[in-house]
Amino acid sequence: LYPLYVTYSIFRSRCAACCEEELDDAKLQQLWDAAVRENVFVICKTPMAKQITRRTLAGYRDIPVNAHYFDDLINMMKNKTRQFVDRVLKPSYWKQEGVKAMKFDAVVGNPPYQSMTNGGSDSGRAARQAAPIFNYFVEQAKMLEPGYVSMIIPARWYNGGIGLNAFRADMLNDKHLTKLVDFANSKDCFTTVDIGGGLCYFLWERDHEDECLVINMNSGEQDALRRSLNQYGNLFIRSNKAISIIEKIRAKADSFVDEMVSAIDTFGIPSKVRGHEEYTEGDILLVHSDGANSSKTSYISRDVVTKNAHLIDKYKVRISILVPQNGEAGVKPEKGYRSMSTPHLVYPGQVDSFSYLNIGFFDNETEAENFRKYMMCKLPRFMMRTTYSSAHISQSNFIFVPKMDYTRSWTDSELYEYFGLSDEEIKLVESTMRPMTDS
């Protein structure tokens, strides 16, 4: 339907340029055919898509329709980019006689989002995983050097990840990206489509450089803010309303929790290490993963610890190195996010494996427990969520989580008051995050 919508828009513009008395049926047909012939050029992924495009624009009439398909479109875009661009820019490819070079005013579309690829073996069967491909369409569209590019694509590029890190960096630093309309819930855009992480569409303008107008769409309401997409480096803050919260916290806080968080693999113990069940004098307790949301303990010698031995006898607070539910990409926003697994205390004489990230170290249990409870509050987890770029958690995800006084306990209400959050900002945090309990 995109070719039809574009053609109709051009057709209406042609009609507007004519006197109303001229617009009889013959003239209208002439204007429509001219728009199809002169203004619309379609790249299709399959022969069927090409045939549907022809029928949509011309019906059963024998008129020229500029529609082509590539036998191996995705491979061409991924591995033969220059060849693809050169072919599309050749007038002969489109059978345009007397034209020296093809120049496209705009490239628009709703490209395919992903393809299934072999990802190794799983119990003797080929493992399948979804690889993003929409990014290739955006990149090739820019290479055609049109005046404008506008496409609707999954919003998961905000977080980077496999196949998207370079694309994200390019998009965030592209000053020609002048408008970004964001749908955290895909059903706010396509009512019958549920896409984890939501959707977005954008406007790229070749001859215009400016900050980007970011528009958050939520249940029919919109919030717009003109800002630099790379305001925080390679971290894209999706919510416009979160910007003011970040700035309030940065203005008030003296330091941030990222200073407390250890590097991944605190003690140099691989996830696969399993200790022994019987305690031997001098042993320490190892906490290791036992599948999703589960852990087990065993005993190991202190010699197994190859890093940070001085932290063994501290009180530690640990979380999983993974964001729950594969990055919570499929979580419906209205149900709320957790941002991290439930934090647990790791006592002196205990260590954990690579599966866990230690986010705080303390000399006494009271401060360790107060910090653990603090991290279960909604505001710290909300601040973590604004930084996510993958399903893995690391030090960098705590750069906006303020360090507090842990000789006392904290509640969200106290945190909201301390940082001076407005009612609207509080509502955003409360509606985004789900409560976290120990159960």
What are the residue ranges of the model-derived segments?
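Short, surface-exposed acidic
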Residues: I63-H68, D423-V429
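SAM-dependent methyltransferase catalytic region
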Residues: L1-K179, N185-C189, G198, F202-V214
